[in-house]
Amino acid sequence: RGHRVTLLISQKKVDAQASKNYGDLDFRTIEAIAMPKIPSLSLLGFGVRLYKAIRFSRHLLDEVEADVVIGMGGFTSFPPVYAAHRKGIRTYVHDSNALPGKANRMTAKCCTNVLLGIEEARHYFNPAKCIVTGTPVRQEMVARKDKNEARAELNLPQDRRVALVMGGSQGARNLNSLVIEAARQCADLCDFLIITGSADFARVSQLTADMPHVHVIEFCSAMAAAYAAADVVISRSGASSLTELAHMGKAALLVPYPFAADDHQAHNARVFAAHGAARMMRENTLTSDDIAAFLNEVLKDSSLLASMNECA
């Protein structure tokens, strides 16, 4: 607050879609850069793209007269942070994960301080540089919504338990399929609100057309309402989702994305499970029966549900 903020985002569709809700902010795009495996013939092309991104970042820093640069992760953050460091501008990197990414560990070497979402990540960096700040949540999450109002907004029943299912920004086809099978077993137990992602919306809508207790949406721009409406959440374990779960105090079944870099989502999920806020299950062994059993256990035991909510 009180500052001019310029947000550098990638050219990916998901970033463009998310930025539409914040038309008052200054968004600029930068090429998404992924570090290739070493050794690799792709290294030459990576080096060229990295050089261009650093040069672009230097010009942008001059244009906006930047006083501070904060990298939020990924190799796309490295060029502006490195360019700012070379220009003598204060630089920071923020990492929300229990296991920080390689890009952040590299970027941190040219940062004034490292900002952490959780304490468990400290030992991956220079401890003297680290400050545990937590992970920011969207403004809409700050004032928690009333459950009944949230359900009315999303056309969900007031007199039933609700399980919120979200597979991350890109959705999760296999997880969605398992949830659909579990939903058939749990028709008398709860309603389901499934956020599918754009790639799986049509398929899930068709498969659940005869299931009135399953509500399917492609993309949710009212996540505060979705969390408030839910009694329990089935989710991937990306840092942003977990931060929101903790802020909203929601019990969860966490299914880490199996192809996440360095399996960092599993590390995140273990932290929540160790604190009693969630159960963690691996996707390669997860069955619809497992999901149904979890929902039956948690939703039929009010004291267990309350305890998990409190631990979150």
Language model regions located:
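Short hydrophobic beta-strand element within catalytic cores of glycosyltransferases
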Residues: 235, 251-262
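A short, well-ordered alpha-helix in the C-terminal region of glycosyltransferases
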Residues: 152, 304-312
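Glycosyltransferases and closely related glycan-assembly transferases
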Residues: 21-24, 55-70, 76-92, 105-113
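Short alpha-helical segment that forms part of, or immediately flanks, the ligand-binding pocket
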Residues: 82, 224, 242-250, 270
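Donor-nucleotide binding loops and adjacent catalytic segments primarily
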Residues: 13, 17-23, 147-233, 266-270, ...
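Acidic donor-binding loop of glycosyltransferase active sites
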Residues: 66-67, 220, 228-243, 250-251
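Active-site-proximal region of nucleotide-activated glycan assembly enzymes
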Residues: 4, 24-26, 85-148, 156
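Conserved nucleotide-sugar phosphate-binding/catalytic loop shared by glycosyltransferases and other
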Residues: 4-48, 58, 133-135, 198-200, ...
